[in-house]
Amino acid sequence: MPFSETDLDRIVTADDLHIAPFRDDGTTYGTPTWIWCVALDGSLYVRGYHGQNSRWYQAAVRQRAGKIVAAGTTTEVTFEPVDGAVNDRIDDAYRTKYAESQYLKPMISDRARSATIRVSPPTTD
């Protein structure tokens, strides 16, 4: 289940997302890490500046769940690694949102692209 359009817009506009995947025990959250985020086709995406060496990325891939804190709200989430052609469109979203930043180039590099994650609220049955 994706974020609502309102929640997604609020998260992306605030640009203050902190990500905290679960630690190896599966119940304790890791230290919240501030990262960039973009929206594409109703989904929220993040990338590891240090690629797959980013600690939060490694935990997100292992645990597949955690929380984000953004726009004054804490949300339980799931994490899904992303690869393939969608990364080109995610690059474009980063270029649009962060065009003036000196950190843009590393965030659209192959290293960062290899650590792209889709962040979603957990599905409810």
Indicate residue ranges for each PLM-predicted region.
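Extreme N-terminal tail/first-helix region
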Residues: 1-18
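Short, P/G- and charge-enriched loop/turn segments at secondary-structure junctions
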Residues: 5-7, 23-24, 104-106
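Covalent nucleotidyltransferase core used to form phosphodiester bonds in nucleic acids
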Residues: 7-9, 45-58
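Short, structured beta-strand-loop surface elements
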Residues: 51-122
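Catalytic cores of nucleic-acid ligases and guanylyltransferases
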Residues: 125
